[in-house]
A protein has these predicted regions:
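Short, small/polar residue-rich loop motifs at catalytic or cofactor-binding pockets
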Residues: 45-48, 170-171
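Short beta-strand scaffold segments in enzyme catalytic cores
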Residues: 49-55, 175-176
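Short, basic/aromatic recognition patches
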Residues: 25-44, 163
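Zn2+-dependent cytidine deaminase-like catalytic core
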Residues: 53-152, 237, 263, 268, ...
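Flexible, polar/acidic helix-loop-strand segments at domain edges
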Residues: 157-165
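Short, positively charged and aromatic/hydrophobic N-terminal segments
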Residues: 3, 9-15, 19
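Active-site ligand-binding patch in enzyme domains
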Residues: 162, 173-179, 183-302
Length: 302
């Protein structure tokens, strides 16, 4: 069954009362989305998820998925409860899980705590899972609404959705140029052509994404650290596309490889040459060439 088929099937099962109390649903889902974003950089490869528990129009619990391997958003919201959740409405950005993983199924916690209604932003993008939790909840007499701020909730999990549906990473390209189409002065002496806001955005992206990839020429010209400079930020894995293994051993990415992971993708098969980098803590990925460069299609599947 495809994801689209699963969505159609769930649409028939769900009691979609979006017109009634729509503004209230939107407001609480907006809060759940804001909570979910707090997990950026800490939950990969899991999705960002936020949850809000409401009883008699009052918020009694809030939570989000804070760290990979730890409690999911729904269980954190229940943990945060300041009143009995029995009869409450749960707003959650993503369909609750119904399988045993690093944590127990969230559907079990919802049922056990007597929650009366669950409002879901978007279904699980995994075609094998989409709609299953909805069905389980409905079978236990819980009202379910799906699709509140659906596009915003889908955008929250764009990285997770890409991987879970294709097995490939979500890639974001960062590119800066001047209004006349240049990326640097002809001498190469220019340091930045972007402003403070753009540079801050770069740091936020480094914190959010698992890896950052550059070509060897960037290393040769700039000797970048490729780290996250945000307070309490998380450093991404540094990936260097270096077909002929020209990255200098004195480069920052090599010298600090034991502190911040550095992966070098190369077509070089010389074991002794690769060992020099491995001694500094680098991980060498042997990737075939295509048109004289690293085959990115192959690299994306490693």
């Amino acid at each position: 069954m495809t994801y689209a088929d699963a969505c159609d099937k769930v649409a028939l099962l769900c009691i979609c009362t979006l017109k009634e109390g729509r503004m209230e649903d939107i407001q609480f889902m907006q809060l759940a989305i804001a909570l979910a974003k707090k997990g950026k950089g800490h939950v990969n490869p899991n999705p960002l998820v936020g949850a809000v528990l409401v009883k008699d129009g009052t918020i009694i619990g809030k939570g989000y998925h804070e760290q990979y391997g730890q409690l999911h958003a729904e269980r954190n919201a229940l943990k945060d409860c300041k009143a009995s959740p029995e009869g409450a409405v749960l707003y959650v950005t993503l369909e609750p899980c119904n399988h045993h993983g690093k944590t127990p199924p969230c559907t079990e916690a919802i049922i056990e705590n007597g929650i009366a209604k669950v409002v879901i932003g978007t279904l699980d993008p995994n075609p094998q899972m989409a709609g299953k939790s909805v069905k389980i909840l409905q079978e236990h007499g819980i009202e379910v609404v799906v699709g509140v701020l659906e596009e915003e909730c889908k955008d929250l999990i764009r990285v997770f959705r890409k991987y879970i549906t294709t097995g490939r990473p979500y890639v974001l390209m960062k590119y800066a140029m001047t209004m006349d189409g240049k990326i640097a002065t002809y001498t190469g002496a220019s340091k930045w052509i972007t402003g403070e806001k753009a540079r801050a955005c770069v740091q936020e992206t480094r914190n959010e994404f698992t890896g950052i990839m550059v070509g060897v020429n960037t290393v040769l010209k700039d000797d970048p650290s490729l780290t996250c400079r945000m307070e309490n930020g998380r450093n991404p894995i540094r990936i260097i596309c270096d077909t002929h293994l020209r990255t200098p051993l004195h480069a920052q990415v090599v010298q600090t490889a034991k502190e911040v992971p550095t992966w070098i993708a190369t077509a070089v098969t010389d074991t002794m040459k690769k060992a020099q980098y491995e001694n500094y803590g680098c991980r060498i990925l042997e990737v075939p060439q295509k048109d004289g460069y690293i085959d990115l299609q192959v690299l994306m599947q490693l």
